[in-house]
Amino acid sequence: MGSTTDTPQPGRGGSIPAYRYNALLAARIEEKWQNHWDENHSFEAPNTAGPLADKAAVAGREKLFILDMFPYPSGAGLHVGHPLGYIATDVFGRFKRMTGKNVLHSIGYDSFGLPAEQHAIVTGIHPRINTESNIANMRRQLRRLGLAHDQRRSISTTDESYYRWTQWIFLQIFNSWYDEKLKKARHIDELQREFDSGKRKLSGTHANTEWKSLSTLEQRKIIDDHRLVYLANAPVNWCPGLGTILANEEVTAEGRSDIGNYPVFKRNMRQWTMRITAYADRLLDDLDRLDWPESIKLMQRNWIGRSTGARVRFASKAGEIEVFTTRPDTLFGTTFMVLSPEHPLVDALTSDSQRAAVEKYRDTARKLNDNERQNDDRKKTGVDTGATATNPVTGDEIPVWIADYVLMGYGTGAIMAVPSGDERDFAFARAYKLPIVAIQMPSDDWFKSHEIKPTADCATWPQAFVGEGTYINSKNKNIAIDGKRTVSEAILLVNTWLEKNNFGTAAITYKLRNWLFSRQRYWGEPFPIVYDEHDMPHSVPDELLPVKLPELMDFKPQTLDPNDETTDPMPPLARVTDWLSVTLDLGDGPKTYRREVNVMPQWAGSCWYELRYLDPTNSERFVDAEVEKYWMGPKSAGHTGGVDLYVGGVEHAVLHLLYSRFWHKVLFDLGHVSSEEPFHKLFNQGYIQAYAFRDSRGQTVPASEVVEENGKFTFEGESVTREYGKMGKSLKNIVTPDEMYDEFGADTFRLYE
């Protein structure tokens, strides 16, 4: 970038005086002071302990920890949407620093993940080279913006010194279990001791077994089943076009990959999973203690989705079919059951005459993703299994069907259908001529509004009645809820009867699913896990961390036919044979172990980065306890502690923000941090919006190359449509800060941003 001199500079319409404020003069002034700030360490915040300590500078000063959601270092660099929040936090931090506060404000880079890997595959350049180059460019852009950051604290999630501690935290979670009585995580060794001493008894399928009668391997499997991180065969989103498994959040509403737009299929695979559901109540209840926007709290509440009701058991020839319902008072109106096509009892339930139809339907359902299956606008389909189950309150034998709108991953994978009180069940019953029994009498006004008589058969009603009316047809010889009573009263009566007669029990369920934590790709944190000859997982010792990511030249995953759901993933690390096998002494002598070949998801590094800013050079701990308490400890009794101000986008409401809270709560339970929550105050800065343009295929085209003439828009001579929305690389409509610096200067850009 050029600089001004004392002689007039040529410009539009003639000469420009040397000290007229323009972009060149702005650059000279701004860079002078940016250099001054660096040379004088103007924005460095002292710690209370460790290499960044300065107790004299800390004494008598109130602390303030300000945090921006750190950027992903893409090849395009920053666009003008990124600084919207950065500038606001910078102004706030500068003001508070001027009032005497000790302000910690820094920024790092969320640099692992699929986008970098996909870019590397396209360009043939190793993702590490790309990532480091992109980070250098972003550092330049941020410095030029004049942000008051403590550069000593900047981190990148791909640094070995950083992901060493990501792996260490993973092992803390892996080596923990959730004690339901104490409502907290505890070390897995404590569970082992409780079983060994007899203090804790076995339950479930081992309820009548003595712990000491089990082999060491059997005991180990039971212990592993309690871990907060565990291996499980579970329905996953398999994307053969990317060669990897995706989290639900990485699949679009159309059932395709968010990156690449490939088809996604539901498959059962063995995957690492984090038991975030153990923390569902705390994640939900502690929202009330946070200074967050109500809209974000509501999104998390809905995502966690706590429901109270009952688990009810229906007897069948294949065994008991358990359902969860929020309305056990409607059991008297249950006239059929619907199971997920993947339900484990389907094979045993299906009659010989219906087997071919059931298998054909299941094959079709396998080709659909969860979003497609639960689309309210899609016609509901199903197949009769030919079996029946017994309604526990009526004693009636009711048909058992399968339907793709019932998901195995939610609830029990089975529902009790009450067509008179549920629109979906009503439509299904109408379509397949299944019985409908009214259990609540609507008001006269309801009948009048639908122009039908109160005496009309409910099967002829135009729709289900979903309101509250007078209970009818709801009694047996032991229980009756007929008449006018509240729903809560009726639920209590039915729940009591179910428990007394061993047909069910009151229960709470959640929409929140456990977190799928494996990725079949290269550019991510390796798992600090090895497997023995029995295929049992073991922790890599702390002193051997980090498990370094091998430098591969061929880092492409085995991408497959995007439409072939029968294929299996082959992670790139599985090809590194000299890395795959390792000899370790884990306490019983040197043995050969096999490394885990999956890597962690991109969310891993961002689950704890706020903690590393506090103590970025500490090689002994992920953060010094005194330093964490100073910057993030609770301010008073009942205060959660955490970052004082966190600024970022609303798009992270149920992903990064929820995952970070989960990790932080585990660290709190284990005594590694003093704060119960990572982010006490949250602010969403909104978006910078811009026009985007799409061609006839619906693909975005570069906005800067679109030509406007007489109100019409073309790209390379072809007509395109214009839409208005968020600025982003994928929409090809970004404007970079560099363009603003060159034309107006950074300070002018900051003012108008």
Regions found by a protein language model. Give the residues of each.
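Conserved oxyanion/phosphate-binding beta-strand-loop segments in alpha/beta enzyme cores
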Residues: 2-6, 14-67, 97-106, 130-136, ...
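Residue patterns forming the tRNA-binding/recognition surfaces of aminoacyl-tRNA synthetases
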Residues: 2-11, 15-26, 31-32, 36-40, ...
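Conserved active-site neighborhood of enzyme catalytic/cofactor-binding cores
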Residues: 73-107, 257, 387-389, 410-446, ...
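Catalytic alpha/beta core of large soluble enzyme barrels
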Residues: 89-90, 102, 343-442, 459, ...
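Nucleotide/phosphate-binding sheet-loop regions of phosphoryl- and nucleotidyl-transfer enzymes
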Residues: 264-266, 273-276, 332-360, 471
